Regions:
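Phosphodiester-processing cores and adjacent nucleic acid-binding clamps
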Residues: 1-190
Length: 190
């Protein structure tokens, strides 16, 4: 999470108004050896900083979402005592998501509604059932089963490199995958 020195959201220099910001990829301590903070701490900090939203996106898991949601409910109870907190929570949105790794690519799937939530749960279940306990098996082709989710994609570094003669088939496959992904997700891919 980005933290400003005075613990408030960044402001537009020209107008002095707060800039709307939502963290769309944040892992909690439920992503073993990667996330350091408890989901409830992440929610509390995001609200304190004036974020408009926070996506809890643990790796092939929704484990952190329940505690994040509970923390948000607890904060809403405190608004009766703290009107400034009520103002910060008014437009705050907890976003449900999960990240998936494959060949140094990172895919972050975000939920927009109940249908998207169902799709994400199905994807996580499929990936977990295909592997030994504690791991998962994800194939990027599974993304084409998602009709309602949003997708953030961070390709591997070599994806951007100039292809060498021996890498032409791989580059052609990557270009085709990118085209298919862009077509399937249309305005839902970043």
């Amino acid at each position: 999470m980005n933290h400003s020195a005075d613990n408030t959201a960044d402001t537009n220099i020209a107008t002095g108004t707060p800039v709307a910001y939502a963290e769309l990829h944040c892992v909690s301590n439920f992503s073993f050896l990667r996330g350091a903070s408890h989901p409830q701490e992440l929610v509390q900090q995001a609200v304190a900083l004036g974020y408009q939203g926070l996506a809890i996106t643990d790796e092939c898991s929704l484990a952190g979402v329940v505690r994040a949601w509970q923390a948000l409910q607890d904060l809403q109870q405190e608004t009766q005592k703290d009107p400034s907190l009520a103002a910060k929570l008014e437009n705050f949105r907890l976003i449900i998501g999960s990240e998936f790794h494959c060949d140094d690519h990172i895919f972050v799937v975000l939920v927009t509604d109940k249908k998207a939530y169902s799709e994400l749960c199905r994807l996580i279940t499929t990936c977990r059932r295909a592997a030994e306990k504690g791991t998962y098996l994800f194939n990027p082709g599974q993304l084409f089963d998602l009709q309602h989710c949003l997708l953030l994609w961070q390709p591997q570094q070599s994806f951007y490199a100039q292809p060498q003669q021996s890498q032409q088939p791989q580059q052609t496959q990557q270009a085709e995958f990118t085209r298919r992904l862009s077509h399937h997700f249309a305005h839902r891919l970043w």
